């Protein structure tokens, strides 16, 4: 085991504070409408220009291991806030820095850190309750536009996101992709889509677009691989007699079965398209069941005693239209039972609540949205790749902020709500003096986001904070026009969820830093740093930063 360096008490806490300040100072310059950008060096390719707190935080590693511990803890604040709320990462870093700074001053002056922590926790709990009680629900398209515009710092993006939400609903899937052109546009795909296309290009109906369109088709859904024509001949004859088109969704279609389908298609006997089933394993079974419920059919599976060669038209689904491209299938207006679809949606929502895996949650949300009806794609375009990446990050943040606003409502933005709730903390009556100090630390920290927004706008932050304190609730500082105004009336709003999550995460990590007494890190051998360091464990290879 390598030797360790250990630092104690004041030295430990001040080292961590230096790390906290290094990361927070790099991130805080981006806060507010007049916040600046940060340029990140990339080992390969051009530098990355960003205005996104968590992206900046993820890039920061400090040389001193003790300072780096402080920086990594603030990085965790930003990352955790991003994971839960999707936005507010810079605010969380600014709050964490303010709590750490004020808290360490009091610990140095003799306050007991454990009692301080208790006061901080009580103050945060009361503040969160108050933020929730002040939240206003987001119902109109205009309110959604305001939230998205503030987060992205761009009204055009705000309008795009509002349009997307209006078209696919609040549970709908909205994806952000890089455009090949310079413009940013919205594309909406109606109905359920999945990433599988036609098995054979001979099945297309439109050679110009290289896609197949089936009007009012029957849909055969099976988890089986179809290779023998005898398996599907009975159902093909029934569909032919009904005079309908047919979409086959199966694990695979090959051999004589595929040849028969292609020949009948080319002769004009039957308009048929075969696609592979989406997903893998248990997820494939679930997605096939989703498609069956959406279209009013059944999954023909031997697991439930259904065989392909015995299947009748009653097992087939129906849809108004199906469009099949090279690598995508879109089922428009499935004819499934509305009650069955509602029950399936409720079941998926319950699974989303119960799952602990981020990956599973993401896939379940995709299934929910596809079943609920529609996918919107925002194609991001710009003059250069650097600008496009920066814009894409802003749109993703704005999208997350908008979802959070729809979930828990909105509060006055620009750090106003934090200042508005400070008087509520006066009602807390802690028993111990150090606990009261913990409450005071939060009261002071709640001013930090507004102060930073004002400073970034070139205005004295302390004066702005005092002015907002004297103003009626909801009146804040519009940093863009440098006017004091009714924030919700002016459309300057923040999602309540983002506001509370940022504070809760910042206080949680900051309180842990305040209660730290000892730091242990691997000893850095200054003689060998960066060199080969002999063959003894190849100790110096760490200096060869070639990857």
From Swiss-Prot:
UniProt-annotated location(s): Cytoplasm
The protein's enzyme class: isomerase
Molecular function terms from GO: ATP binding; ATP-dependent protein folding chaperone; isomerase activity; unfolded protein binding
One GO term describing the cellular component: cytoplasm
Top-level taxon: Bacteria
Keyword Nucleotide-binding: yes
Keyword Hydrolase assigned: no
Record-listed ATP binding positions: 30-33, 87-91, 414, 478-480, 494
Main location: cytoplasm
Record-linked PROSITE patterns: CHAPERONINS_CPN60 (PS00296)
Pfam family, any one: Cpn60_TCP1
BP terms from Gene Ontology: protein refolding
Xref: HAMAP family: CH60 (MF_00600)
Matching NCBIfam families: GroEL (TIGR02348), PRK00013.1 (NF000592), PRK12849.1 (NF009487), PRK12850.1 (NF009488), PRK12851.1 (NF009489)
Function: Together with its co-chaperonin GroES, plays an essential role in assisting protein folding. The GroEL-GroES system forms a nano-cage that allows encapsulation of the non-native substrate proteins and provides a physical environment optimized to promote and accelerate protein folding.
Protein family according to the UniProt entry: Belongs to the chaperonin (HSP60) family.
Subunit structure: Forms a cylinder of 14 subunits composed of two heptameric rings stacked back-to-back. Interacts with the co-chaperonin GroES.
Protein name: Chaperonin GroEL
Gene (UniProt): groEL
